Amino acid sequence: GKLIGTPEYQMTAPVWMRGILGDQYGIKSNEIRWRSGGQEEAGRDERTPFEAPPGLDLEPIPEDRTLVEMFEAGELDGLTTAREPSSYTMRKPNIDRLFPDFRSAEKEYYRETGIYPIMHLMGLRKDLAEKHPWLPGSLYKAFVESRDIAYQDLAKTAALSVALPWVAA
């Protein structure tokens, strides 16, 4: 029954984080008490409305508080966020990663499962694909071309231009 903060329970990164914790470590989402709210700024509104399913303990934090502030005060046991909290980057006492050697843990997870956690995906409505049969293939080609341009840009600099954790692996 740990108390864990997250900007939005339904955000992409916390979704796959919960999946990994469940699949790899047997920690079920409904065994955790969840609190949602602004990570660094108070009063954050959810971008996507979400109603927690029965059995899930999910409540918003007070509007005048932030997740980081509550975490630093010991009112939350942990955070699941897409961005490092300032309390971690500022090396506040008693604040650390769940996996201190996270790069090795991430690589090992990929080696074991073959899964690279995604952030976003694109979908196409079936009625549009049926009405315009050329559309799925054209969208696919556009994304492949975009990816190829991005890969070319990666080779142009001596410093990483993206935050892909395993780009050098």
Walk through the language-model features, giving the residues of each.
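Surface-exposed, flexible loop/turn segments at secondary-structure boundaries
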Residues: T12, E40-A42, S87
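A short alpha-helix capping/helix-coil boundary motif
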Residues: G1, D45-T48, A169
